[in-house]
């Protein structure tokens, strides 16, 4: 029962955060975020992913469970509750991938929960770092989707190699 309560509270907090972000998109800070997302030199699907991640509207298992589409929100890699923060930062596969890529994101050691937390904390990165960062995040999400649809899971090293290759092609 306590677990269901925590999930319900988390869903309400997430919903409030999405509304807060959506409501302040005219502010200078949010305008800067949107401009930086849309100006990154990467494929449109990666930009779209970044936009959805920044608004916390990725269809994670946690979000799908809140909408009563699925019954449990367990991560396919580690069994913990699957939120966007978990998939991108705190899951064992995500940590392994970021370590392999070698991007020095100091916030990642603090286990952030929101995509915008990482964006705000690392907004001084160079353009190439952001493009690689965006590509790695998209590859983590893409790997999650492939596993959810029955494909074999990849380890962090494979995801990092895929991200580097994809980034180099762009």
Q: Where in the sequence are the language-model features?
A:
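A helix-boundary/hinge signal
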Residues: 1-170
């Amino acid at each position: 029962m306590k677990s269901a309560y925590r999930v319900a509270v988390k869903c309400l907090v997430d919903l409030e955060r999405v509304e807060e972000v959506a409501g302040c998109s005219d502010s200078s800070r949010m305008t800067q975020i949107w401009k930086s997302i849309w100006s990154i030199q990467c494929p449109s699907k990666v930009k779209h992913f970044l936009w959805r991640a920044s608004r916390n509207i990725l269809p994670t298992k946690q979000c799908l469970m809140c909408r009563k589409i699925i019954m449990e929100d367990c991560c396919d890699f580690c069994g913990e509750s699957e939120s966007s923060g978990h998939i991108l930062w705190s899951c064992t596969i995500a940590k392994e991938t970021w370590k392999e890529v070698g991007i020095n994101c100091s916030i990642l050691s603090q286990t952030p929960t929101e995509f915008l937390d990482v964006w705000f904390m690392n907004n001084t990165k160079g353009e190439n770092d952001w493009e690689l960062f965006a590509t790695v995040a998209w590859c983590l999400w893409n790997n999650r989707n492939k596993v959810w649809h029955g494909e074999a899971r990849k380890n962090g090293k494979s995801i990092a190699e895929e991200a580097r290759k994809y980034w180099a092609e762009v």
